[in-house]
């Protein structure tokens, strides 16, 4: 899928390799593309994958005087700085030879992982049974779930509880169809064991595809709930 407006798009920069001059830069914005067309439609090798239907694209006209080696770089998704990835490709461009069909395609690897529950900086209560819940999506914003185009059964999604730099528990997370998130219960440790609170971390790992994502947040631990403030 394509990094479109739903995830903030991507920044694209075209640089002359010889002298380092920036020839063009801008944002790729638009739709993320037709998932059925991209993921499931059979096609010949020379047929376009992404541009056969409206999808996000960055277009530039370069005033080249001669064949020029350029570096085309892209970084995104811009709406998720914690998951920002960058890639580049070097190629020769020739004046008068416009790129057609899909043009130059750059691939970014990773997942958007977001802890949905508990929400920082929410305090956790010692000995409470708490549910850790997180969403996992591709960088383009497509849902990762069992039996989907991005099948969660083929990757590892797990949670970790950390006290300081030490992992004290690893949690196996399961998909919940109603909330469309992955979840796992855990018990909150005592404040004496975690005086500076705990860190919750969720990891999505696909070593075969080279895609990884992580989200983490720190939570204070209290002995008991604070009384509600009266107004």
Language-model segments: residues:
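Short coil-to-beta strand junction motifs in C2/discoidin
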Residues: 4-11, 147-157
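Exposed beta-strand face motif in extracellular beta-rich ectodomains
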Residues: 66-70, 155, 194-201
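Short acidic/polar inter-strand loop motif in beta-rich domains
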Residues: 55, 62-85, 204-214
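Sec-type signal peptide cleavage vicinity
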Residues: 1-28
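Short, surface-exposed loop/turn segments at beta-strand-coil junctions that are enriched for proline
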Residues: 187-194
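Surface-exposed loop/edge segments in extracytoplasmic proteins
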Residues: 18-26, 163-172, 211-212
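Short, compositionally biased P/S/T/A/G/V-rich stretches that sit at domain boundaries
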Residues: 92-144, 223-231
């Amino acid at each position: 899928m394509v990094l479109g407006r739903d995830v903030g798009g991507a920044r694209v920069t075209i640089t002359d390799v010889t002298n380092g001059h920036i020839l063009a830069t801008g944002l790729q914005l638009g739709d993320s593309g037709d998932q059925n067309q991209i993921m499931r439609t059979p096609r010949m090798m020379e047929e376009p994958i992404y541009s056969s239907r409206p999808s996000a694209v960055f277009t530039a006209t370069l005033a080249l005087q001669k064949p020029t080696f350029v570096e085309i770089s892209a970084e995104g998704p811009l709406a998720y700085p914690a998951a920002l990835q960058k890639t580049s490709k070097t190629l020769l461009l020739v004046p008068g030879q416009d790129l057609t069909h899909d043009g130059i395609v750059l691939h970014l690897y990773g997942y958007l992982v977001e802890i949905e529950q508990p929400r920082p900086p929410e305090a956790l209560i010692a000995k409470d049974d708490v549910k850790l819940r997180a969403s996992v999506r591709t960088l383009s914003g497509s849902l990762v779930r069992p039996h989907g185009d991005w099948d969660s059964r083929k990757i590892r999604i797990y949670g970790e509880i950390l006290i300081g730099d030490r992992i004290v528990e690893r949690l196996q997370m399961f998909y919940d169809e109603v909330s469309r998130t992955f979840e796992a219960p855990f018990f909150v440790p005592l404040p004496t064991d975690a005086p500076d609170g705990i860190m919750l971390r969720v990891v999505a790992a696909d070593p075969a595809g080279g895609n990884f994502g992580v989200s983490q947040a720190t939570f204070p631990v209290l002995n008991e709930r604070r009384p509600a403030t009266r107004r």
